[in-house]
């Protein structure tokens, strides 16, 4: 089961908006749908945010309120440097990501602050099980090492 928590914007700390999917394919459909929506970064009018974090009932958004991750993880990539910028940036980015991470199943989508010259994106990975809160710091450290620390350190989901 893949599950997520939805936040209206960057300031929203309410954790009651959740969704669950019984297959990765259905979860992917949501990701692709969200990626086609027009986004805005930051503030009360920003795009909705999703997180694999599931929270203790009645608690607000904070690390200490997380009880598990819903069988997926992602890396927010805000400072990726393309090896070759002479051609089409999107084509080059796809090529480089495939060369580095093609052995893994993942979904990649751009974030609201992405530009053609400075792509910012999320890599979303299915997991074989949920990650309990007690294991999250070790899991995050291992995942970041595995993926060459390309993820934004401030965003641990």
Q: What is each PLM-predicted segment?
A:
Residues 1-121, 125-138, 142:
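Signature for HUH/AEP ssDNA processing cores
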Residues 144-157:
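Flexible helix-coil linker/hinge segments at domain or subdomain boundaries
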